[in-house]
Structure formats: C-alpha cells, structure tokens
Design a protein with these regions (language model features):
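A short beta-strand-loop structural module common to alpha/beta enzyme folds
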Residues: 48-58
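N-terminal [4Fe-4S]-dependent radical SAM core
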Residues: 1-20, 27-28, 169-209, 491-494
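Radical SAM enzyme core and accessory elements
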Residues: 1-8, 19-21, 28, 417-520
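Flexible glycine/acidic-rich beta-alpha junction loops that bind and position SAM and/or redox cofactors
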Residues: 267, 296-297, 320-324, 352-360, ...
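Glycine-rich beta-alpha loop elements in corrinoid/cobalamin-binding modules
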Residues: 56-173, 396-441, 450-455
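Short secondary-structure boundary/capping segments
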Residues: 36-38, 126-128, 147, 227, ...
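Canonical Radical SAM [4Fe-4S] cluster-binding loop centered on the CxxxCxxC motif
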Residues: 33, 201-238, 515
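Conserved SAM/AdoMet-binding glycine-rich loop
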Residues: 21-22, 82, 242-347, 351-381
Length: 520
C-alpha cells in the first residue's frame, strides 16, 4: 500500500457531493501535475464536497477505494491526447457505461478539463457529458453549486450552459481564466508519496510545486499553450516567497519546482531564486527560455541545487523564422557555454517537420546539433531530444498536415548522421496518432470506443488524418479561446514566407486580465 503525506480524509456520508478527480496516466505523472493538486485542494476546501483521486490504471479512489460508479461527478484531466484511451478504460473498469447515451440517472456525471478539453474536446464528446474550457478555479464553485441544485444533472445538461466556460457538444463556449493569480488556488498541503520506488516518485522528485505565472508572451506559431492561455499573468514576488515558505513548512519539503509556461520570463526570476535559496530551499524548473537566461540566474540556480537546464532551440535559424522563434544561433551557443561554465548539464529539445523545412535545413540541422554537442566539456553533458512537429488547434499551424512518410525519412536521416548515444526521436507512428486525436472531430468516436475492446490498426487512424485548408470548417469552431481566426490565418501565411511577428512581451505584464481578452 502506498503511503502518502497530506492526503485528505473525510467521511463521505457527511457530504453532499462526492467528486472523483481522475488522472488518466500513471501516478508519478499525476503527482507532477500542479493542476491535479489544485482541483484536489480547491474542492476539498468546500465542506459540502469530498474530492478523491483516481489514477490510471486503477479505477478506485486512493482515499477510500471507492469505484468510479459510486461518485456523483467523475472528472478527467486531459493533459495529453494519448490519454483518451485510458479515460475510456477507467470508465469501463469503474462500472460506468463508456458511451454517454448508454448511461442512466444512476450513473455519475462525467466531465473533463485540461489543455485538450480547452482546445479541442470534440473527439471525446461521445463519452464526456460536459467539458470545462479554461482554468478550473474560475468555474468549479459555480459548477458544483449547479450540480447540487439539480435533482438529476445528467438529464438537465442544458442548465449548465448558463455557466461561462462549460461546453456541451454543439454549443458555443468561451474560455474562462482566473483574472488575478492572487485569487487562484495555490495548494500548500500538497500530497506527495513516501517511497523510493521510481515508478511513484514525481518528475520533480520530492518538490513543492510553485506556480509563478500562467500564459506566455513569445508568440511561437507551433505552441498551443502559448496561444490559448493568454494574456500572461504572474504572481507578485512577495506572495510567491510566502507561499513557498508556508508550503514547505506544511510539507517538510526542501526543494521547490517553479511551474509556468515561461518560468524564466518571470519579471523577478533572479530575486525569486535568491529568496528561495536564502530560505535554504533547492530550486528546479522544467525548462528555461534561452532569451531570459543570464549568468547571474545560472549561478543562483546552480547554488540552489539545479543540475540540468533544459532549453529548446527547436531547429535551425531559417526554420525558426517560420516558427516565429526569436532566438539566434549565437544566443543558443552562448547559453550552452554559460551552463558549461557553471558545470551544469544541458538538455536540448528540437523538432522536425516544421513548416518550410527543407532537405538543406535537415543537413544544416545535423551540423548545428554536432556543433552544440561539441560545446560540452565532458561526455554526455549535453543530451538531445527530437520530436516530430504536431499541428495543434488554435495555432497558426493548425492548417498544416502531418506527413508521416516525411517524418520517418527525416528521423532516419538524423539517426544515421548524429553520432551520440544520448539521443532519441519520438516514434513517427505515435506522433501521427497524436495528430489525429489532436486535430480530429467526432468521427474519431467509434475508433476510440473500439480501442477499449480491441487493437485498432494504425491504418484506420491514418485514414482519418485530417487535411484542412484555410477555408475549412474546423471541428473546434465553437470553442472561443480568445484568438482571432483571421490573425491566425495571417500568421500562417507569414510563416510560409518566413516573416516574423513580434510577440506580446513588450506589453505590460500584470496579475490581471483585461476585460476584452481577444488577442491581437
């Protein structure tokens, strides 16, 4: 039995709402997700609600061992499209009919949130009753109140349309966000496991998760998170240090993981890291923006316990121009040299298959990677990860098609020409499947359902690979995330001509969201 610290135990007989927060991936991934902690803490702050966690491959709660069918609401966090398969398995194994039209008033209300639900929930509409589009704290209180108000929520789904941010299939919805991050949920008593088993240890180890900002100002044309979670908001330094101090006191943890789409863009990142170090805390972060890394920041992170920095050059300069990635080769090399100087390891992320990429670009990429690897002062100090580019909804590249044959050829070329061991490329077939799930519509429902009971041949998924033009009606047309479609079309055309657009990082960054949040 797994021992956890800070798990919340209530008597479910004394609450009005039993809520299952489900993570359709492994425990270590679930406990690395700040959003999963936020839902747990936020809902359990209500006396009338008991939120329990259910983590794949289990279909019973960690707190009381209750099957999913025993809950009033079953909620799934959709972080990755490949997790859709696990959602359906968890429903089946939890005693809930997989297809929503087969459920009765005796079954729970099934909802979903997270990035995939906010960008394109359409492939899952055969299985999920309602979706939360946006940031949960902005809507969950009103949602729970509505559930408790209705005698049978599943028979009255239209009643939820009064709540901004709740999506019911075939209805328009506008994404909701927390206006001021000081009003967001910042869990202090975060749950963490007491174990040495690597299968259960979160990605950041025994760390307190500290959210410094939401959103991004960089304007990369391939990045869904950077497009839909706008505008950028950040927490004041004083509040962050107080949260870290209180959280680490309540958990006993000695390391802080900084969380945000663009952590190193935080306006007081050096002061934050210095403050945490002065508290005697180690600091780690998932990745850093090359443009924001300074000698002083690396020195602070080094003395705070960081061993590896992760940066994303993405490709060579000619391709970066199409992607609107404002970093030069010189800045990448300079950053790596700074890291080596401070005896830090470096992990580099690249993509293949970005729009405008040519055979000549691939040849240049091999030479560029070789040049960067040679900057290391010792073996394996610089590691490499290469992923196929996958178009995403609500981005300028949503009209691009995924070319499996081309990706396979490029992956083979890199494998033959990059001579280092610490190098991996994501499987192109898996990337194709992710593309279909990310960009498809409700035509995927039947294959998803079949996948619960049998292995669906990859060819059948490939046959449903979309091919959108600028005039196509997109499946997510009813999902308003605040991005002007005409702006996206203009950006796509500029990308094909390798023209760059300044990001929004010159705008004032505050904790508040403007009333009109349509971008550009």
């Amino acid at each position: 039995m797994l021992l956890e610290h800070n798990a919340i135990i209530k008597d479910f007989r004394n609450v009005d709402m039993r809520f299952a927060s489900c993570y359709p991936n492994l425990y270590r991934s679930a406990m690395s997700s700040l959003g999963f902690h936020i839902i747990y803490d936020f809902l359990n702050s209500r006396e009338d609600t008991y939120c329990e966690r259910v983590v794949y491959p289990m279909s019973k709660s960690l707190e009381t061992g209750s099957p999913l069918k025993d809950f009033d609401v079953v909620s799934f966090s959709l972080q990755y499209e490949q997790d859709y398969f696990n959602v359906l398995k968890m429903l089946k194994n939890g005693g809930i009919p997989v297809k929503k039209h087969e459920r009765t008033d005796q079954d729970p209300l099934v909802i979903a949130g997270g990035p995939c639900a906010s960008s394109n929930p359409i492939p899952m509409t055969d299985f999920v009753d309602l979706f939360i589009v946006g940031e949960a704290e902005a809507v969950m209180d009103e949602f729970i109140d509505k559930c408790l108000e209705l005698d049978d929520p599943r028979k009255n789904l239209e009643e939820f349309l009064d709540i901004e941010g709740v999506y019911l299939a075939d209805n328009p919805v506008k994404m909701v966000t927390v206006n001021d991050l000081k009003d967001a949920c910042h869990p202090l008593r975060q749950v963490f496991p007491e174990t040495d088993n690597k299968d259960y240890i979160p990605a950041f180890g025994r760390s307190f998760l500290l959210e410094v900002s939401r959103g991004c100002t960089r304007g990369c044309r391939f990045c869904m998170a950077g497009c839909i979670f706008r505008p950028r908001r950040e927490m004041p330094l004083k509040e962050l240090l107080k949260i870290a101090e209180d959280g680490c006191q309540k958990t006993g943890l000695k390391k802080v993981a900084l969380i945000g789409a663009a952590v190193s863009d935080y306006s007081k990142i050096e002061e934050l890291c210095e403050g945490l170090h002065e508290m005697g805390l180690q600091v780690t972060t998932p990745s850093l923006r090359i443009e924001s890394i300074t000698e002083n920041l690396l020195e602070i992170l080094k003395v705070s316990g960081l061993k590896t920095i992760t940066i994303a050059p993405e490709s060579v300069w000619e391709v970066r121009k199409a992607a609107n990635k404002f970093i030069t080769d010189e800045s990448v090399e300079s950053t790596i040299k700074k890291a080596i100087k401070h005896e830090l390891n470096v992990k580099l992320y690249f993509m293949i298959g970005l729009p405008t990429e040519t055979t000549a670009d691939m040849k240049d990429l091999v030479g560029y990677i070789d040049k960067l690897i040679r900057l290391g002062s010792r073996r394996n100090q610089i590691k490499l990860s290469v992923n196929p580019f996958i178009p995403k909804p609500h981005t300028p590249f949503q009209w691009e098609k995924f070319d499996t044959k081309s990706i396979k050829s490029k992956a083979k070329y890199l494998n033959s020409n990059i001579k280092i061991r610490s190098f991996k490329i994501e499987n192109p077939r898996k990337a194709m499947l992710q593309y279909v799930l990310s960009m498809g519509g409700n035509e995927l429902g039947e294959l998803l359902y079949r996948s619960v009971y049998e292995t669906v041949p990859m060819k059948e998924w490939a046959d449903l690979s979309p091919n959108y033009s600028l005039d196509s009606e997109l499946p997510w047309k009813n999902i308003d995330v605040g991005m002007d479609p005409e702006f996206l079309k203009g950006e796509y055309k500029m990308a094909l001509n390798k023209k760059m657009t300044p990001g929004v990082r010159n705008l004032d960054v505050t904790t508040a969201v403007p009333a009109n949040r349509t971008c550009f």
